[in-house]
Amino acid sequence: MERSYNMKKTTTTRQVLPHVRPPRLAAALLLAVCCASTLVAAPERGELVACRIETDRGVVPADKPETAIVKVTLAADRVASRERPPINLALVLDRSGSMGGEKIARAREAAIAAIRRLDGRDMVSVVVYDHEVETLVPAQPARNSEWIEGRIAQITARGNTALFAGLSQSASELRKNLDTGRINRAILLSDGLANTGPSSPDEVGRLGAALMKEAIAVTTIGVGTDYNEDLMTRVSGNSDGNSYFVEKSDDLPAIFTKELGDVLSVVASRVRLTVRFRAGATPIECIGRDGRIVDNTVTVDLNQLYGGQEKYLLIRVELAPGRDGETRLLADAEVNFEDATSRRSAQATAAGRIRFSRDAREVAESVNVPVSREYTLNRNAQELDRAVRLADEGRKEEAARVMRESAGRLEAAARSLDAPELEIEARRQNVQADSIGSRGMGKAERKLIVTDNYMLYNQQSK
């Protein structure tokens, strides 16, 4: 039997960009910590991607069924910039009428700054859209930067928003260089609702899923408070790209710089993680990522891994009763990927075990605080998603109640895990719940929640 789950994703470190809204604390709490439940395969010199398995507790109670949270982490090594793979980049820029003034000026500035970070190995194209689509710069080597920058400088705002058509055209430009060993990325910028052509999150999301199959990741950048954050995060999520909410257009250059830093640090592509659980362990739910569960095997596909960053998957697992003192093989993980520089296929593996005990103290002392905290934060994010849906339906009091109840669970976890950061997050969430309960959820507030949750679910750095 096959079960699919679309839940969602955190980062080892969070860097606050100049003038960009500070990250919600929840999104910055990942720690690289090993405990008794971990068989560590940390990246070593010459090892491109390492895999490791952890559980929320290294020891669980014996003689009865139990539930465990399994975390499978992929850690990518850093690669010197001179060794990086070439880039196949498409900039997809909204030039509709609402982008007038400072927005279009900052978008031009950010696009030009992005071009200047590329070199002669890289390919670049620029597509602009309003109610029509124009390929301003057909795919070509980035060394033609002076002419490309001149074309970008001519962009002016006008018309409506044919977002789907603009993204589709950018994919056509990227396809001209798909088989050249380059890292494929479209950066889609918009400040408004798609109102020409396909415009629903499902329709545009399907395009993102199709591009994922071609190893094209789509990063979305929403400017202001009038764009559709559900649509933008859907297309990014389905293609394994990043997503940003930029409240002030002045922040666009910093966001483009951050995004190009990610693209230029890709070390692995076409990544498939397979986790096979042993007898006595049944995977029930993927928490935070799109995961496919077939019998006792979980599979997740990622488009790319960035050097120096970690991506992980949380899986809720049911355990058959174990005897006191028994150590059981829990799961085997295998990650297959393509080295982004050499284009050779590679693999990394890991195995995980868990122990059973009647000693309650031994169980309590085996708690893996980082894994438990990440699980708590992801569950809280899912509750915030539920609050957003309730607020959308006009049920603001219920939305506030969901947020307060989830904040209460954060407070309890803060005490049991000795994690004061969770207490701070709970207080912030309670204040937010009071505001939403009295006046509803504003557009900017909704975008913050949706985008922050996306970044948490996807381990996207800020």
Describe each region flagged by the PLM.
Residues 1-21:
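N-terminal secretory signal peptides that target proteins for export/translocation
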Residues 26-37:
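Bacterial N-terminal signal peptides
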Residues 49-51, 68-70, 87-89, 271-273, ...:
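Hydrophobic residues positioned within well-ordered beta-strands of beta-sheet architectures
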Residues 43-47, 51-270, 319-325, 408-416, ...:
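Exposed acidic/Ser/Thr-rich ligand/metal-binding surfaces
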Residues 287-310:
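Extracellular adhesion/glycan-binding regions together with long Ser/Thr-
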Residues 311, 319-462:
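Long, acidic serine/threonine- and proline-rich intrinsically disordered regions
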Residues 272, 276-295:
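A surface/secretory-pathway sequence property marking extracellular, secreted
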Residues 134-137, 278-286, 340-344:
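Short aromatic-acidic-glycine turn motif
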